[in-house]
Curated annotation (Swiss-Prot):
Residues 7-18 have a biased composition (Polar residues). This is Cell division cycle protein 123. Keywords: Cell cycle, Cell division, Cytoplasm. Belongs to the CDC123 family. It comes from the Eukaryota. InterPro entries: CDC123. Regulates the cell cycle in a nutrient dependent manner. Residues 78-99, 328-350 have a biased composition (Acidic residues). GO terms for cellular component: cytoplasm. Residues 1-23, 73-102, 328-351 are annotated as: Disordered. PANTHER family: CELL DIVISION CYCLE PROTEIN 123 HOMOLOG, D123 PROTEIN. GO terms for biological process: cell division. It is found in: Cytoplasm.
Length: 419
């Protein structure tokens, strides 16, 4: 996922500090990753999430997602006279077998859910949506109208592959945070296919929020474009999201550190929970950097720093005359000091405000719409077409590709000899 470097780079507190060799994350446990799985947290917050259905996946379906190549079940179509003409064609015997025969119940449940949700859904697995594979879809987004639309996105996505193959990378067992992943077996993941009713979200009103020690530390917009209308609304949106977090999430989510995404549609009176992500480097910090977030002070850190400063004092040895002079000076300054103390107390009582970062008009990221997202995950159309035609199509494509390379090498050698 894309990262954006922050304008404000974190500063070292002293020149004597050693440079960090790794981000100072607390250990990420297996349970934290599972707590951020959709099937775990969505039942806790069903009333504040968009309408969805989580379908438990069988081992056969998970194996289908993991398998190389893209073989889709035959489409359900109404037969026509033209179809009957091809009933006994030579190609009928060479068709790929229907993979859905091994998970018919799941296939039927997916079709039923699509119908229940008005004919359009968006898919995701436990943690990730196949956003990197939308270039495979005719609509160039996550909108799916048939089961095959869903299968095509899931099997083309590197994000989904990561969910399947590497969900616990960099994690440690819960019993001993000092242990490594090799010290204990990784837990089994109950994989689910999440289908959400398709809603045309306004991307400018989606926000990512970072929580540490059950404190909303900072938040930012998710879409990486400039939206001028957000700036007058910044304080109102921050207040609305803060109240939502305090009431719905702060004390109910199992872990003290996590990242959550919200959607605040017009008229901006209600907040919807869209996703919960791990407090880990795998989660995109978007307009922040993780080092910046990890070094931010929350109310507890600010209070500890102030208490440390108060404990620093100087002992003075005074004789009688010096003591009298000092007492007179203290009497003169008592009024001003009292006023300063009152001001300090007022500052202490002011609420902690999380930083709310938006993309400004002159930021380099302000016009990211000209850059396609997830371009590193895309393949040429010829490769996709070959993979859809089965192993034979891919073999034929590789043969042609080798012929092209050999021809180019031969032409290059001929040019070198001519020179």
């Amino acid at each position: 996922m894309p990262h954006i470097e922050s304008e404000q780079q974190p500063l070292a507190e002293s020149s004597n500090e050693q440079p960090l060799e790794r981000l100072p994350f607390p250990p990420v446990t297996y349970s934290h990753i599972l707590h951020c799985s959709y099937h775990h947290w969505q039942p806790l917050y069903r009333n504040i999430t968009p309408r969805s259905c989580a379908i438990p996946l069988s081992p056969a379906f998970v194996s289908y997602l993991r398998a190389d190549g893209i073989v889709l079940p035959p489409e359900d179509a109404t037969p026509t006279d033209d179809d009957n003409l091809d009933t006994f064609s030579e190609d009928s015997s060479s068709e790929e077998p229907d993979p859905s025969t091994e998970w018919k119940e799941i296939h039927a449940q997916i079709k039923s859910t699509i119908a229940d949700f008005g004919g359009k859904v968006t898919p995701k697995l436990n943690w990730s949506a196949p956003k990197d594979a939308t270039w495979m879809a005719a609509t160039n987004d996550l909108q799916c109208r048939t089961p095959n639309d869903i299968y095509l996105l899931l099997k083309s996505s590197d994000f989904v592959t990561h969910d399947l193959e590497h969900p616990f990378d960099g994690c440690v067992p819960d019993a001993d945070p000092g242990a490594t992943a090799s010290d204990a077996p990784t837990p089994e993941v109950p994989y689910h296919l999440v289908l959400r009713k398709y809603v045309n979200f306004n991307p400018s009103l989606e926000f990512r929020c970072f929580v540490r020690n059950r404190v909303l530390l900072c938040l930012c917009q998710r879409d990486q474009n400039h939206f001028d209308f957000l700036f007058p609304m910044r304080d109102a949106l921050r207040s609305r999201i803060q109240a939502f977090f305090d009431e719905k999430l702060r004390d109910s989510f199992p872990d003290p550190n996590f990242v959550f995404d919200v959607y605040v549609p017009a008229p901006h009176q209600r907040v919807w929970l869209v996703d919960i992500n791990p407090w880990a480097v795998r989660t995109d910090p978007l307009l922040f950097s993780w080092l910046e977030i990890l070094q931010m002070k929350d109310p507890i850190g600010i209070r500890e720093a102030e208490e440390g400063a108060e404990e620093q004092f100087v002992r003075l040895a005074l004789n009688g005359s010096n003591a009298a002079a000092l007492e007179a000076e203290l009497d003169e300054g008592s009024t001003s000091e009292s006023e300063e103390e009152l001001d300090d107390e007022a500052d202490d009582d002011s609420p902690f405000l999380p930083e709310f970062r938006l993309i400004k008009r002159d930021d380099p990221e302000a016009y990211a719409f000209t850059t396609p997202q997830y371009s590193a995950h895309k393949l040429p159309k010829e490769v996709v077409d070959a993979s859809l035609s089965g192993p034979g199509g891919m073999s034929e494509f590789l043969g042609k590709w080798q012929d092209i390379l050999a021809k180019q090498a031969q032409e290059s050698d001929s040019e070198n000899e001519a020179q």
